[in-house]
Amino acid sequence: MKALSKLKPEEGIWMVDAPKPEMGHNDLLIKIRKTAICGTDIHIYNWDEWSQKTIPVPMVVGHEYVGEVIDMGIEVRGFDVGDRVSGEGHITCGHCRNCRGGRTHLCRNTSGVGVNRDGAFAEYLVIPAFNAFKIPDDISDDLASIFDPFGNAVHTALSFDLVGEDVLITGAGPIGIMAAAVCRHVGARHVVITDVNEYRLELANKMGATRAVNVAKESLEGVMEELGMTEGFDVGLEMSGVPSAFHSMLDTMNHGGKIAMLGIPGGEMAIDWSKVIFKGLILKGIYGREMFETWYKMASLIQSGLDISPIITHHFKIDDFQQGFDAMRSGQSGKVILNWD
């Protein structure tokens, strides 16, 4: 089968002829229709320090996808051949305390599809049936293929009550932009998103942000004054991993504010903890999606009218995958879809 593999420990991704994956008794065999390129895939492509420590070589990469069930193990229940599915990319152990307590997104033994084991950038994928999520008929393949990162946005945004609240999002990558759309959809008052990438900030405007702020050109405090905000942000969503962005968030949070953190800093990050203490801030780390509550919320948000389609800016046939990676690496894109049909 065709597959995109991290074939060598150097920059790049390569098209290979890989063996079709073998299916176990509790697995689904999925024929891939569409995949999306994630920021993680760009880290793997670039072969940065994290990738060198984490990624086995060679390995088929990719974890954002939609496909069709074409076969299943003899123990599988609840799925049929022909079902359209996406899937949770974190394969959990099932026996640690968090798994047994129903907090599977906090499994200490998680194995990542396309990170620790062969992934979805291939004509076929095998995953445990437990990890698959049926896609409702009224949700398109394009949207289903980005459910993984959309789930990061939903999990982060819905960590705290948003109705009537003022929200600051630092980092206008695709996940931050989708989080802005979620916040507005569920009833936040002002949703302000910051970055220095004008292309991404314009996308954020299209997706419903109250204000998309280029912090290289204007001050966050000035924007707050413009919006009539006198007490600071109630909720912060840190999506960038950039220390200066987080420092700005701490400075502009209201007392008693709540911060959900998804962005991963490149190294240790010093902060002024006195601001956290004296403002009584609550910090929550976010990893992945809640299994599977986030997935049901994603489908329901779209079915209730949330439109995240503007975040998809590029489509390429799989044979043109290099153009897709080039678009993502340029920073002048939203989500990039690779078509396998």
Swiss-Prot record:
Q: What class of enzyme is it?
A: oxidoreductase
Residues noted as binding Zn(2+) 2 in the record, renumbered to the chain: C93, C96, C99, C107
The site (Important for catalytic activity for the proton relay mechanism but does not participate directly in the coordination of zinc atom) lies at D148
Question: Could you state one GO biological process linked to this protein?
Answer: L-threonine catabolic process to glycine
GO CC annotations, alphabetized:
cytoplasm
InterPro entries linked to this entry: ADH-like_C (IPR013149), ADH-like_N (IPR013154), ADH_Zn_CS (IPR002328), GroES-like_sf (IPR011032), L-Threonine_3-DHase (IPR004627), NAD(P)-bd_dom_sf (IPR036291), PKS_ER (IPR020843), Zn_alcohol_dh (IPR050129)
Its localization reads:
Cytoplasm
The UniProt catalytic activity note for this protein reads: L-threonine + NAD(+) = (2S)-2-amino-3-oxobutanoate + NADH + H(+)
User: What keywords were assigned to this record?
Assistant: Cytoplasm, Metal-binding, NAD, Oxidoreductase, Zinc
One GO molecular-function entry: zinc ion binding
Q: Name the SMART domains on file.
A: PKS_ER
Q: Give the binding site residues for NAD(+).
A: I175, D195, R200, L262, G263, I264, I286, Y287
Similarity comment text for this entry: Belongs to the zinc-containing alcohol dehydrogenase family.
- HAMAP family, from UniProt? Thr_dehydrog
What protein does this entry describe? L-threonine 3-dehydrogenase
Task: Name the gene for this chain.
Answer: tdh
